[in-house]
């Protein structure tokens, strides 16, 4: 086996300037373009194809677990948003507000949806009367608008694409179970589709979603050592139910309020894919996600039989269920190799006259550049399938090793700063549960609490105040 070590000079090296590297990959791989409005990007076909793959996988999982898709309006009356005090206070600073309809001032301002809890609540209150109407488990695929001051493609935009699920239940137990199930589906999606390991846990009171009783999160670690919140699932209890009068008659004919959840992931996942797996040559896509899993590049394609053989291989692989393309453009093989690497296509097959004569082809793995000769026979589809599965495992294992090596247990404040400055990643520490100590770490080290460990009990004292610890919590600098 040999390694392919082409360097793409169009991309700033990742370890020289991570932010510029990220922007270069987004642009050069043709995932997006900037529009004339800050924070509102154009999703180019290749970038949107990645989102479609995520949609397809997750939509199937949602429907398997009893959820239905709906669509709610984009505009929310201001009075409706104001019904839940904590919720509106959390979102008011980032709301986009419509004040005119045509040339006329509106009697009531309309909020461009930052999230749709209030719309779902209003609707559920109308359609639910009895325990027989429950549960209601709705999801919508849409865009949201939150007026961000600092924007970056996919990671933080004023407009973002996402799914938001909203469910109501007759019992607290059922709603809590739903909350954790959806968090687990997000974690599964990250592992099985994106090859990204996640840190999971519960958000602190300060970091939880506005209006929620509890928020559960999946947190990814980027190559630069910063965390990225990649999905959240919220348990609301009956707060919204009481504000919106969402009630039902139970089996004993008693009037009760419902219990509610919401959960969502967004196109932030595209940013995670780039920053976890990408390298100096561009994207590195997990095979199960990649819109094109295999690209076949004919060498000396004008010679008799070369293009025909490339098409024959493509037909074989497509028949076996793989997503395949043949690059028969008139560009040079070197250009095609570079383009395939930039786009992160997991497997490249090279086939030319000599390969055909000898009955083999050259297979190149994008994740590590390893080249292998494979026979051009009926076993090729299985060999390529196995290679794709190997790539997924290697990518996940590499990301998991990076994550695990960047979780550092600390016992003092000085250690927090030292680890974050020199190593990055997560610091794992005891915490008393007081917001003042949480804020102290943010002020001193620009790090926020990412989640509370659900599996480890605190044993010791909080390094900020010396009081007995209540939780083990992870802090990190984050996007």
Annotate each language-model stretch with its function:
Residues 1-479:
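NTP/phosphate- and nucleic-acid-binding module
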